[in-house]
Amino acid sequence: MEFLSRISQHLGIVEDVDRDGTVFILGKEYAPLNNKSRTDVETDDSALESLINIVSLNPGLLSDVHSRVFFTYRTQFTPIRRNENGPSPINFTLFFRDNPINTLENALTDPDSFYSDIGWGCMIRTGQALLANAIQRVKLAREFRINASRIDDNELNLIRWFQDDVKYPLSLHNFVKAEEKISGMKPGQWFGPSATARSIKTLIEGFPLCGIKNCIISTQSADIYEDEVTRIFHKDRDANLLLLFAVRLGVDKINSLYWKDIFKILSSPYSVGIAGGKPSSSLYFFGYQNENLFYLDPHNTQQSSLMMDDLEFYRSCHGHKFNKLHISETDPSMLLGMLISGKNEWDQFHTYFRDSQIIQFLTTRPENDLYQSANMSVGSDSIHSLESDIQDTGEYVDVGTLVSGKQMSSPQPKDEEFEDVKCKSQRIIVCEDPADPEVEQVLVEDSSSC
């Protein structure tokens, strides 16, 4: 049965959809299997059972997943110049994750430039995926599905905006450039959810052709100030508004208090996905079934899109393979994305989430709001360099290290590192011993009041 296992692995989605339980993909609801599914077949062999499942999976579900846009690590892209005070582009690990000949050539000919985002770009890639699916919905509608036999020229033009060169408005290069200007972050440093949100806001507000002219971000919570939204729709009743919430929903894992709300977000018609993941990687979550989150993984390395023909590039940006992760295994630091198209949708959105434990609606921003400036200091946003990434054996930020402040480039005022969510019934307590530098600051969730 090893042969069947290999087939299932090649198909990529065999073991990721259970026979029972409704599947939700960015607001769309699917039965997992066809009516003609062979669920009555009895077998003790899991590989054969998985193969039977894939044959009977709902084709509408598969088409929807395949139509999601996502991005991965790339190599040999247009070089990004290293900042003299930033991390080095050259690391021994790249010889194993990239073509060693390419890595050696880059090291010899241009050692001060990044030709790949391996090890530091996964959060940017998942942020790009979130943004691309939001733009796809605006430009092509949620019902859009790709055709395996031909390229959709309108979507191809959309995806080209994300190609890896500074001349493309939504490229990785411009994500890096935008955040370097905002906070001083340097090429090769790992983006956190807040940095990703700030970059997205900066880039789309400077590129109205994308169709989303308005973006509200919250880098410390999921608070929505109603007066700010009202002004947007007063100016343009049909405006598209992208909401980005960089939140932290627990200490080292998502508090079970929020599970229901995460599922509600992904099943809502407003969701454009979640960028976050496991402690060792950032992933793009686009749906769920039962208590498992479905995701697309940006860590599969591909060559630069500029070296591909149109068809190859087009196919490389669609999620034909996905995986699942139980929500209890998910890192609590994440970026939530939601799209609202017009005043009527805003009213519906407000009603839909009025009882949320994550999203809060407030009348107006208080004058003394500590987070109004979005905390632009370099050390405040989970910066993670390629060098520290190799030491920590993962691309995603180590929450424990962040909370301790050991990776901070400069001392920060108390509590500014934390990306905690200020929910209606949660109390966050910061425990520390200032006299002992070895004692980590820890977020303790007191659920007794929930």
Swiss-Prot record:
| EC number assigned by the record | 3.4.22.-
Q: List locations, semicolon-separated.
A: Cytoplasm; Nucleus; Preautophagosomal structure
Q: Where is the active site?
A: 122 (nucleophile), 297, 299
Cleavable signal peptide: none
Q: Which GO terms describe its cellular component?
A: nucleus; phagophore assembly site
What family classification does the UniProt entry report for this protein?
Belongs to the peptidase C54 family.
What is the protein name given in its UniProt record? Probable cysteine protease ATG4
Per the UniProt entry, what species is this protein from, by scientific name?
Kluyveromyces lactis (strain ATCC 8585 / CBS 2359 / DSM 70799 / NBRC 1267 / NRRL Y-1140 / WM37) (Yeast)
The upper taxonomy is: Eukaryota, Fungi, Dikarya, Ascomycota, Saccharomycotina
